[in-house]
From Swiss-Prot:
The gene is mtgA. GO terms for molecular function: pentosyltransferase activity; peptidoglycan glycosyltransferase activity. Pathway: Cell wall biogenesis; peptidoglycan biosynthesis. Keywords: Cell inner membrane, Cell membrane, Cell shape, Cell wall biogenesis/degradation, Glycosyltransferase, Membrane, Peptidoglycan synthesis, Transferase, Transmembrane, Transmembrane helix. This is Biosynthetic peptidoglycan transglycosylase.
Amino acid sequence: MISVRRGFSQLWYWGKRGVIGIIALWMAGILIFAFLPVPFSMVMIERQLGAWLTGDFAYVAHSDWVPMDEISPYMVLAVMAAEDQKFPDHWGFDVGAIESALSHNQRNQKRIRGASTLSQQTAKNVFLWDGRSWVRKGLEVGLTAGIELIWTKRRILTVYLNIAEFGNGIFGVEAAARHFFNKPASKLSASEAALLAAVLPNPLRFKVNAPSGYVISRQQWILRQMHQLGGKTFLQENTLD
C-alpha cells in the first residue's frame, strides 16, 4: 500500500512539474514571438507528423515569413471581413458571436458554428493541437488573453497571416500567393485576397486553384463585406497598434 501511495505521489509530483513546464514554455513563446518570426506552428507540426506516420515523406509543411508591410492591404482586409470584423475593437473574444453560435448550435447540432476570433485562431494555431475538447478550449482562452495582453493587434494579424493554412502543405500568405498566383503577397488583388480568405474555414476541403460554387459565392460575399467595411479606409481608420 505504501509503495502504491508513493507511486501516486511521484506521479502527481512529476505531473505538476510537467504542467508548469508547459505553461512556462507557452509564456516564453508569447514573449519571444511578440518580436521574432514564428518558425512553425502546432498545426504545421501536426500536419507534418501526420504525413510521416502515413508514409508521405514528400510532404513538407512550408511557410515563408513576411512582415506586415509586405502583405497586400487587401489580404489584411479580406481576413477581417471573412473571419472577424470586430477584430480592431474586441479584447480577444466576440461575446455577441459566441452567444449567437451557442444559440445556433443548440438548435442545429449537426452543423456546428464556431465563433473564434482571429486572436483565438492565432493562439490555437501557434500553441495548441486541433480538436474540440473543453480542455483545449480552456487553454485557448488563456493563451488568447496572453497574446492580447502582450502583442499588438498588428502583431496578432501578422502572425495569423504567416501561419494560416491555405492548402495542403501551404502555410502563410506569402507561400499561398506564390503557389496559387505566382506573385508575392504584397501584390495580391482584392479578388485574389478574397479567394484565399474564402478557403480558410477548411483549406484541405476547399481549393483555391479549383474553387467550388460555395467557395466562389463565399469569395463574392467577402468582397461585398470588404466594400461595406470601407475598403482601405477601414485599415486607415484602424491602425491595429
